[in-house]
Amino acid sequence: MEAHRFIEDFELVVAHLGMWPSFHDSEVLKLVLDRTHVAGSKELSPVLDLHLRGWVMTSEVTEQGFYKLHGEAVFHFRFEGVSSIQLEGFNNQNVLSALNLELMSHPDDASRQVLQVELEHCYEF
């Protein structure tokens, strides 16, 4: 399975952009860590909400010499059951080189898969 298919409602991103993007040059607008009740549960769970301004860059060039962007939007991802996080160097413009996703075995139960998410930074993020 492609890792992005592990994300609930990934089809909304694909429908909007026509594909699953790399999120190259996307900007992290907001990152929120919270302990909250996950839908259908009374237990608290660590949750990370990520808001990215993203698009698909085309090969077409505007009159101003910039690449044309397709489907520019703010995408909200909610990651539930977060077990580990590492943050480095937050600044005024947190541009990504890519949003890397990888399916891995759950550390406590090898029969379950979990999603590893890396916000590959262009700068110190």
Describe the function of each predicted region.
Residues M1-F125:
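Surface-exposed, interaction-prone regions used to assemble/regulate multi-protein complexes
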